[in-house]
Structures are given as C-alpha cells and as structure tokens.
Amino acid sequence: QTLFESGDEIHFIISDVKVTFMQFPYKLKSANHIHGLSMSSLLSLAAMKAYALVGRAKWKDYVDLYFIMKDHYSIKEIIKKADELFGSSFNGRFFRQQLSYFDDINYTEKVEYVGEDVQDHIITEFLTEISYSPF
C-alpha cells in the first residue's frame, strides 16, 4: 500500500511495516543487504537523522535519535559520522541546539512504538541533557 509520494520520497506499508525510499543527494555506502535491498548502517542512519533534524523538525526523528543515543551510539559518534558523510553541509553545533528546541516540531507522522510507548517528556528531557553534555 502506498501512503504518499513527494518529489524525493515514497512511503509504503509492506507487511505492516512502514518503508520509505528516498533520493538522497549524498553518496552513502550500504552496510547491509537484505533481500536484495541496500541499507545504511544504524550509525549512518543516525547521521542522516541528525542532518535532517537541522532542516526539518519531525517528532519521529527525535524519537529515533532518542532510541539510537540511549541504546547504541553517543552524540559524539553521530556528529563525527555526519561530518564524514556531509562535510561542511552539516553543523554539529546546530544539531546539538536542535536536540533541545521543541517549539516547531512537526507531529503529523504518528509514531508507533514497538513495545512500550515512551512519554514525550522523557524523550525531550533525555535529548536536552545530551545536547548540553560535554564532548
């Protein structure tokens, strides 16, 4: 089932899983190949979320970054990877600021949690703390 399509993205639901295919202006190496599909590593996906967050504030990206930083990678690792992938097009300082700025968030895409829901204030408090933590 196709959910929606824009100029550079198309969103599907395949076997109850939301899948997005996008055209991306940067060349990224695929770390994983699953059933013939190339996928970036989790760290590269986190870096792409960091890059996107500076230009668009979608709640789903904050939620994804919350889980990635809570369970997998530090903000330092994500910023380092984003610098490698995007060079001067990425600004780590702006990313850190955006992690603690919640006034213009777009909530149009509902977040569906696997397992227990996490309350919004838990996510915002965690990300704010991370954004102010020393490198």
Whereabouts are the PLM-identified features?
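Compositionally biased terminal segments of proteins
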Residues: Q1-F135
